[in-house]
């Protein structure tokens, strides 16, 4: 499944990049937890991305943290769920953090993880994400 492939990709490609930069990180599988649902900006459609990736810089005086939504998607569902990928791409620019802890905290969505059709986009997004920390 795409979910298993994502975990393998994380262990072999993403994790070494995070370790190289000495970043603290957690990849969390969202098992249909209602509190982790997000809603599209345009129509309020409910969406529960399969994975959340939390990354934090260690040992810095200024806290810099990042939360990324990751959605593995089988090729047969790419067109049907295109609205979800569009929504994920809007999160970084559209989100608003209203908590006092929001300073230095970034939320974003990544392109769908799909080994057949989306690896270039996904890999590029991961590299950009890691490089900004």
Residue ranges and their predicted role:
Residues 1-133:
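Electrostatic, structured charged patches in enzyme active sites and in nucleic-acid/phosphate-binding
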